[in-house]
Amino acid sequence: MTTIDEALAMLDPKIRKRLGPAVGIKTEFQPTPSPGLNAALGGGFPYGRQVLLWGSKSSAKSSLCLQTIGLAQKEGKLCAWVDAEMSYDQEWAEKLGVDTSQLIYSEARSVNDMVDVTVALLHAGVDLIVIDSISSLLPAVYFEKDSTELKDLDRTKQIGAESKDLKHAWMMINYANNQEKPSLIIAISQARNNITP
């Protein structure tokens, strides 16, 4: 049986630099206001990950995220809110424990806007980013080429455009999430009606 050291010694030195024993790898968790959810998640939402918070309309997804931001701020974490729904309410956020003077806020109307803002926030060292909600983001197919001008509706019918753009978005965001100082990204999404029989 080959040992770890023997296996690593057989590898190319460039690859060997990136490998090692799987010890000392720890995940930090951000507690939520829900003890039950924290227990189910092993301590809360994990840093260094992308979390999808999905549910029906008005099921307190945004409120849970705002309360989680408030808890993170009390731990000294820098937080951001990317608003695609245009539904952020400063007064409500403050009632839920958010220090809004220390919360970075940005609007995002398209998937491209969201990626640009989120990647910039990750590079700036923001600890926790909430995107509310990915269901409201327009895919690139809705815009004229290299423009923010919307196309006519009849030229936007491309099956899977939103899914395709979001897939690429999450790949870029995952790559930008620095594992030396991992951030937590929470994306909110809404359940849609099933239109099939």
Can you say where each PLM-predicted feature lies in the sequence?
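The Walker A/P-loop phosphate-binding site
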Residues: 2-106, 114-123
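P-loop NTPase motor core
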Residues: 63, 108-197
